[in-house]
């Protein structure tokens, strides 16, 4: 083993934060320093030349002053016995650079602690400095040798039930954490006695996973008796009733990893399999939808818990039918009170928590980063979500009890697209090869399915921790590229059957795969790729290593599939074959035995059906006592309640532009305010058709009325999606995610009532189907504190996600009030018809009350009339703005609309009810619309004709003032400056950003939000974007070839190809593996586009690993050097491609003054819609655009331009090689965050070579080349946005 020191691992502000944390724990640390250490395991000695290459590979990241470490060493390494995802990618890069002597490169962090620390204090410090799930701690650098020790495979064990009987299995149930019910223990004992043998631990574990509540949904399939009366249907049958009543437009329901609904016809854009040139295939683009929960892992370890939640849901989408494509995601969280230090709110009580779970604050600081990071690296935009906090001690039928989300809800969902011929899974032929596609087995996530099925507190802490998985999104991207290549083959798709690997690992996925395909399976344990050789057979077969799929492939199609995997560098292994006999046979060549020999009948047979015998209990509630509440105080409290407060800290961490198909993200208007009701994507780059998704949940209402809570969740998802042009209500399909503390008095019957309200009544009446969903039935946390039994129980929680196809994505409305459209009116559609009920409201919550009567959907016909009329008005373009009424009531709705429009509003309450509190803050169903003077009468007539005359009231108008005013009898009852409420609304996000990110950046952004004079984004062009300057050249007929270049982990190649294709290029898909293998030569290309993403997962520096695999590989270096030296070529590098080109500058003439691009100043991934100004430069791409100012998509974590010295920067500027700069909304060069999202000096964000042929930029023009893909744009822009000009300039140059 050789050891190489790396750069400092913590920036100044992160060092300060870490020091504070240690001091708060009472550990006397005076100084702290951390740096990376690289451990290199060698097959044989490195030559001097190879050692030099290795040293250059291990020099990456921002320049930081060198430091001589002092103090006690705490060395944090990847967990001993594992191979980290970082190591596998870094080792790949080393091998691609010709360093074949290297067996493995691992990385650790050496913390040096100065202070008078005892051995015990050092151990306490180590606990805070590492994550025990994925890391180990060493105290001597040489002990890192343990990382490379190979471990001996462990043997099988069995449970002796032949001698020990039922008691032996009952003991194993506890020690293995199987969560088996009593009747399941009886079932197993009976079946193994029939077989006259003892079960192996692996067989019991496999049975427990396959039959866990998590996988089998026993409660949803149970028989029910309520108050002594037998119920006619199971919960699942009531959900299925929605499909039986309205099967319209559903292509697949209840039987696959996701549901499928009918989409529009459009051109699917992808590289054609025969030529690898991109093109359009016009066909129906059907929509798949899925929403998952990952609650238990997120409570234990939020970052990996939420990351693998998103990763698992993405795999569900990709494994639908015989392969499909995930497209856009959503994330949601429900947690207990945040109790932010220094920002504790008057309604927040701190009830305490068990040590084994993290606090709500830590979940919200870490969990969203995990979910966002997975989506970002995979390349899926996260476009909507929700965030609720609830923790309150209430009077209920059980006496005083605390209700809340100590066991959080972590929602991960999304939509994708699938070909019509691929919706149904095929047959598995006998002899089909059974393949694992994806990463290796690792000893993680054991028992995830069973652990998720227990109330928190029933299992041991070690088992809880073992049940969390860890993520490697770049691996999942590689697998998805293979699946994409398969479905793009159309009728030649080699996939016969596919499932993702989730709960229970292969022990669940492989039996499910073969049994669904009507077959059994014979497997070889030692063929499973395995990064931890010391695992037992149980651990190899049952671990929940992520990023894996199981696939059945006919033998004659295997070679083609293997070639696709090799091109994408996606790991795969053939581990078995399908058999006629319906058994699972697992052989272990190492120990010459068979750990599993079970019929599918026993494994998936008919364990006893559950029966629930429960009683109805519903809290009556008491009237709210708010006589002393001041309206201004109530407004401020509500704006600080996380469910209502600004959520920028949850949004800008997530890429919202990747794919180039995003038509509506969360950020609205020129001021980029996060208030959108709905997420919208385009079907393709050649279409205005699309897809929409929106969420709804009103969980606190369930404490007073289970049915109302469920109806309101459905209704809210519909009032949200109504902002998009859906048309027919029957076109909308719902995912229902049910969470409940099963067994808690009253909750089971309440769940039944809620499912019945939605499945048997509301959805059939609306003509809406619920073809997909998920349940999580163990939402209670129990522990002991100072000898006292404590518990926090979640309300029965239904989270609904509505999906629909969109007729015209240009018609989507936002909450932004328009003050540039002449005289206009604000109109409230009040579906509560003046009842103004406040039970379970946000207002009640912020005063620590519950109330009595909740809002409800009382009249289905009225609701349908509202939806249909609003849709008609959306389609006809008669409305200027739309925002539904939800948490915080009318006050919040109007305030958010004014924030989005950066304007004022004047609202009269006279016709809305007599009680100001109830009128302002009730959360009855409804919406506020803005209507121009000329459309006003037509709009009012449309609602009246629909029978909604008594619901529709003109309430006021937007104003140009910095004031939001609510009046009664023309007297102000509640009034403040918009800036005041905008600032209060931003406080929660500001405090969270300060805790999590660079506090200096958080403060700069907060100050910007307090400015009343912010003019917002602008567009000021020096050219006509509607002019197609490439048209004369396209007419000549011969298209120049552009290599759309990608490396493993790149995810922005489709949109790059689409932009070049539109400009008249022949866009060719080129993987780095094609160049290294000699399949493709850059000699044949006139242009090259290095695309964005996370090549090698940004290991060894963003874009640096990719560049170095070119610099230190003879064939690749030769190809690129020759390409850049030709004077008839052009090259563009965007984001990751920009980082890559800047590291390749020794091969690119005229780039010696280019900077490197390193970690953002905020030290956070930044997804923004930022203003830039095109500079006078030599760039051929930006040639005639100089002086133009316009917004552009930004999505990166390492975009800060770092120059070797000030002279380098001034030389670049003097040579006119700076091509783009960030500017602020006042048109000045941006130095402050977030107008300058990464901290680059003088806003520099694009550079060009001396001759202008090579341009590298961090922002993403290829994602916004269509006007509809811009988060905001001036009304007058046509189909092409101004950024399309770049690509046409390139086409014109090449002639």
UniProtKB/Swiss-Prot annotation:
Active site feature: 1135, 1260, 1262
One term under GO cellular component? cytoplasm
**EC number in record:** 6.3.5.3
PANTHER family listed in its UniProt record: PHOSPHORIBOSYLFORMYLGLYCINAMIDINE SYNTHASE
MF GO annotations:
ATP binding; metal ion binding; phosphoribosylformylglycinamidine synthase activity
Its protein name is Phosphoribosylformylglycinamidine synthase
What reaction(s) does this enzyme catalyze? N(2)-formyl-N(1)-(5-phospho-beta-D-ribosyl)glycinamide + L-glutamine + ATP + H2O = 2-formamido-N(1)-(5-O-phospho-beta-D-ribosyl)acetamidine + L-glutamate + ADP + phosphate + H(+)
Tell me the first and last residues of the signal peptide: none
Q: Which organism is it from?
A: Idiomarina loihiensis (strain ATCC BAA-735 / DSM 15497 / L2-TR)
Q: Which SMART domains match?
A: GATase_5
Q: One Pfam family, short name please?
A: FGAR-AT_N
Query: HAMAP family, per this entry?
Result: PurL_1
Q: Which InterPro entries match?
A: Class_I_gatase-like, FGAR-AT_N, FGAR-AT_PurM_N-like, PurL_large, PurL_linker, PurM-like_C_dom, PurM-like_C_sf, PurM-like_N_sf
> What is said about its interaction partners and assembly?
Monomer.
């Amino acid at each position: 083993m050789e050891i190489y020191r790396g750069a400092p691992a913590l920036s100044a502000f992160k060092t300060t934060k870490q020091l504070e944390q240690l001091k708060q724990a009472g550990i006397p640390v005076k100084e702290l320093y951390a740096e990376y250490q690289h451990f290199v395991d060698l097959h044989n000695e490195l030559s001097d030349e190879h050692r030099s290459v290795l040293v250059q590979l291990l020099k990456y990241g921002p320049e930081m002053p060198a430091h001589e470490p002092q103090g006690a060493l705490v060395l944090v390494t990847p967990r001993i016995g594992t191979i980290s995802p970082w190591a596998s990618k870094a080792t790949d890069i080393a091998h691609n650079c010709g360093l074949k002597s290297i067996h493995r490169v691992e990385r650790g962090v050496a913390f040096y602690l100065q202070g008078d620390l005892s051995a015990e204090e050092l151990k306490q410090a180590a606990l805070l400095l590492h994550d025990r799930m994925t890391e180990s701690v060493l105290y001597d650098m040489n002990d890192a040798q343990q990382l490379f020790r190979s471990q001996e495979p462990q043997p099988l064990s069995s449970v002796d039930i032949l001698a020990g009987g039922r008691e032996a299995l009952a003991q194993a149930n506890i020690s293995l954490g199987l969560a088996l019910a009593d009747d399941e223990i009886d079932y197993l004992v009976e079946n193994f006695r029939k077989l006259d043998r003892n079960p192996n631990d692996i067989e019991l574990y496999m049975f427990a996973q396959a039959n866990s509540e998590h996988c089998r949904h026993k409660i949803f399939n149970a028989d029910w008796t309520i108050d002594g009366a037998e119920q006619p249907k199971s919960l699942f049958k009531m959900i299925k009733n929605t499909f039986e009543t309205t099967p319209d437009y559903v292509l697949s329901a209840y039987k696959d990893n996701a549901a499928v609904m009918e989409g529009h016809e459009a051109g699917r854009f992808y590289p054609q399999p025969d030529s690898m040139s991109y093109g359009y295939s016009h066909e129906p683009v059907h929509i798949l939808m899925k929403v998952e929960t990952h609650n238990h892992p997120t409570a234990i370890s939020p970052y990996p818990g939420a990351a693998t939640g998103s990763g698992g849901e993405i795999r569900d989408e990709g494994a639908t039918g015989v392969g499909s494509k995930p497209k856009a995601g959503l994330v949601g969280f429900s947690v207990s009170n945040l109790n932010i230090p220094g920002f504790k709110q008057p309604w927040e009580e701190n009830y305490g928590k068990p040590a084994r779970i993290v606090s709500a604050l830590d979940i919200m600081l870490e969990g969203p980063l995990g979910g966002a990071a997975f989506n970002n690296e995979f390349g899926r935009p996260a476009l909507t979500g929700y965030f609720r906090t609830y923790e309150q001690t209430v009077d209920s039928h059980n006496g005083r009890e605390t209700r809340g989300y100590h066991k959080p809800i972590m929602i991960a969902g999304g939509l994708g697209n699938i070909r019509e011929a691929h919706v149904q899974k095929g047959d598995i032929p006998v002899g089909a090869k059974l393949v694992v596609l994806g990463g290796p087995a690792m000893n993680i996530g054991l028992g995830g399915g069973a652990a998720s099925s227990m109330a928190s507190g029933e299992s041991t802490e070690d088992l809880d921790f073992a049940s969390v998985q860890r993520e490697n999104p770049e691996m999942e991207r590689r697998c998805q590229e293979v699946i994409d290549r398969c479905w793009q083959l159309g009728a030649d798709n080699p996939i016969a059957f596919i499932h993702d690997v989730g709960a229970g690992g292969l022990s669940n996925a492989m039996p499910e795969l073969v049994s669904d395909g009507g077959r059994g399976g014979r497997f070889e344990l030692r063929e499973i790729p395995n990064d931890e050789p010391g695992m037992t057979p149980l651990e190899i077969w049952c671990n929940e290593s992520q990023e894996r799929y199981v696939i059945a492939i006919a033998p004659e199609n295997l070679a083609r599939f293997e070639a696709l995997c090799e091109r994408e560098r996606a790991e795969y292994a053939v581990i078995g074959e399908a058999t006629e006999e319906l058994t699972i046979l697992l052989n272990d060549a190492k120990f010459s035995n068979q750990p599993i020999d079970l019929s599918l009948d026993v494994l998936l047979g008919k364990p006893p059906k559950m029966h629930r015998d429960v009683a109805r209990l519903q809290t009556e509630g008491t009237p709210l006592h708010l006589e002393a509440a001041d309206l201004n105080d109530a407004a401020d409290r509500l704006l600080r309640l996380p469910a209502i407060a600004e959520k920028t800290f949850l949004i800008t961490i997530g890429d919202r532009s990747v794919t180039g198909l995003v038509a509506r993200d969360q950020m609205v208007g020129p001021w980029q305010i996060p208030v959108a009701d709905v997420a919208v994507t385009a079907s393709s780059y050649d279409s205005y058709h699309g897809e929409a998704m929106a969420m709804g949940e009103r969980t606190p209402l369930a404490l007073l009325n289970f049915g109302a809570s469920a109806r309101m969740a459905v209704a809210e998802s519909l009032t949200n999606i109504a902002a998009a042009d859906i048309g027919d209500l029957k076109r909308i399909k719902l995912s229902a995610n049910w969470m409940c503390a099963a067994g808690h008095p009253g909750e089971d019957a309440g769940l039944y009532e809620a499912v019945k309200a939605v499945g048997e009544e509301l959805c059939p009446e609306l003509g809406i189907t619920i073809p997909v969903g998920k349940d999580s039935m163990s939402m209670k946390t129990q522990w002991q504190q100072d000898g006292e039994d404590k518990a926090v129980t979640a309300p029965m929680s239904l989270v609904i996600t509505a999906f629909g196809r969109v007729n015209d994505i240009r018609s989507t409305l936002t909450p932004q009030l328009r003050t540039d459209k002449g005289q206009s009116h604000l109109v409230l559609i009040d579906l509560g018809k003046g009842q103004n009920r406040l039970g379970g409201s946000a207002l009640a919550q912020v005063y620590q009350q519950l109330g009595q009567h909740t809002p409800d959907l009382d009249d289905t016909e009225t609701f349908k009339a509202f939806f249909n009329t609003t849709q008609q008005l959306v389609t006809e373009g008669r409305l200027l703005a739309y925002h539904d009424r939800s948490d915080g009531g009318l006050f919040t709705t109007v305030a958010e609309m004014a924030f989005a429009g950066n304007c004022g509003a004047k609202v009269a309450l006279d016709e809305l009810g007599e009680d100001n509190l109830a009128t302002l803050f009730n959360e009855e169903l409804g919406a506020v619309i803005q209507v121009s003077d000329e459309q006003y009468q037509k709009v009012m007539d449309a609602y009246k004709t629909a029978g909604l005359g008594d619901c529709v009231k003109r309430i006021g108008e937007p104003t140009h003032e910095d004031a939001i005013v609510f009046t009664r009898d023309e007297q102000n009852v509640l009034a403040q400056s918009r800036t005041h409420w905008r600032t209060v609304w931003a406080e929660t996000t500001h405090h969270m950003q300060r805790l999590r990110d660079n506090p200096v950046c958080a403060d700069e952004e907060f100050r910007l939000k307090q400015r009343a004079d912010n003019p917002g984004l602008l567009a000021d062009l020096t050219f006509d974007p509607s002019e197609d300057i490439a048209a004369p050249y396209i007419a000549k007929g011969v298209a120049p070839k552009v290599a759309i270049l990608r490396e493993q982990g790149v995810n922005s190649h489709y949109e790059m190809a689409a932009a070049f294709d539109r400009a008249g290029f022949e866009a060719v898909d080129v993987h780095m593996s094609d160049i290294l293998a000699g399949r493709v030569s850059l000699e044949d290309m006139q242009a090259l586009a290095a695309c964005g993403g996370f090549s090698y997962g940004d290991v060894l520096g963003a874009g640096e690993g990719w560049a170095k695999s070119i610099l230190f590989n003879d064939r690749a270096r030769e190809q690129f050097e020759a390409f850049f030296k030709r004077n008839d070529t052009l090259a563009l590098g965007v984001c990751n491609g920009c980082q890559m080109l800047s590291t390749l500058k020794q091969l690119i003439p005229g780039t010696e003054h280019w900077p490197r691009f390193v970690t953002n100043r905020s030290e956070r991934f930044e997804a923004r819609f930022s203003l830039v100004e095109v500079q006078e430069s030599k760039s051929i791409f930006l040639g005639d655009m100089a002086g133009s100012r316009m917004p552009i998509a930004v999505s990166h974590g390492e975009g800060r331009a770092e120059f070797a010295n000030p002279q380098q920067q001034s030389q670049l500027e003097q040579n006119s090689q700076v091509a783009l700069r960030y500017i602020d909304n006042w048109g000045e060069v941006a130095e402050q965050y977030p107008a300058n999202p990464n901290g680059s000096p003088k806003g520099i964000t694009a550079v060009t070579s001396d001759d202008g042929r090579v341009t590298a930029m961090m922002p993403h023009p290829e994602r916004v080349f269509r006007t509809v893909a811009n988060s905001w744009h001036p009304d007058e822009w046509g189909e092409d946005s101004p950024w399309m000009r770049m690509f046409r300039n390139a086409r014109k140059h090449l002639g």
